[in-house]
Amino acid sequence: FLQAASGGRIGSSNTGIIEVEALKKIDFTLTEGNRLALIGHNGSGKTTLLRVLAGAYKPTSGKYECIGRVTSLIDPMMGMDGELTGLENIKLRGLFLGLSKNEIKNITEDVIEFSELGDFIKVPVRTYSSGMVLRLGFSISTAINPEILLMDEWMSVGDSDFKRKAEMRLNSFISKAGIMVMATHDDELAKSVCNKFIRLEHGEIV
């Protein structure tokens, strides 16, 4: 393998396929009340590690054990379908987040009200502006009480008015999480929000 300047290590397999070893020798344990910051430059492996924790990527070696429901703010629009209406996407993303039908029903009115989409909630998401889609995804993701919360950088959503109430909702959402893992390149933000820290370089803890 060759060390990659962009992070991780790259090489080729016996079949000639390019492979990237994005993470190596990652070892840590988190318990209730932990707020972990994954700190590192772009390409250091932060987002890849978050995606492993979210279950989106499976590790090729080692063991990952998670007890509790994981809520991800890595991509608040993940699991949404542009051909479906906003209302249908509340149900779809709710299922993607592991919610029951009753839980989805209970959060629907809150999502509609907080997202401020009005009648647009009844039309296909492909007709939305990027800001509207982000507001919907954010409103769905933050409508539940997270047991384990994963965040890729600190989120900023919408125009100035919406951003203010989104910031308040996000702070409340984070405070309810039993465990939080946040990827960031901002040391000061990490110190203000987290109580545990891991620095990554080229996919390894340093």
Task: Outline where the language-model segments fall.
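Pre-NBD coupling/linker segments of ABC/ABC-like ATPases
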Residues: F1-E21
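Conserved ABC nucleotide-binding domain
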Residues: K101, K105, V111-T127
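The feature captures the beta-strand-to-loop junction immediately N-terminal to the Walker
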Residues: I39-H41
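Conserved catalytic segment of ABC-fold P-loop ATPases
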Residues: S192-R199
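H-loop/switch region of ABC-family ATPase nucleotide-binding domains
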Residues: T184-H185
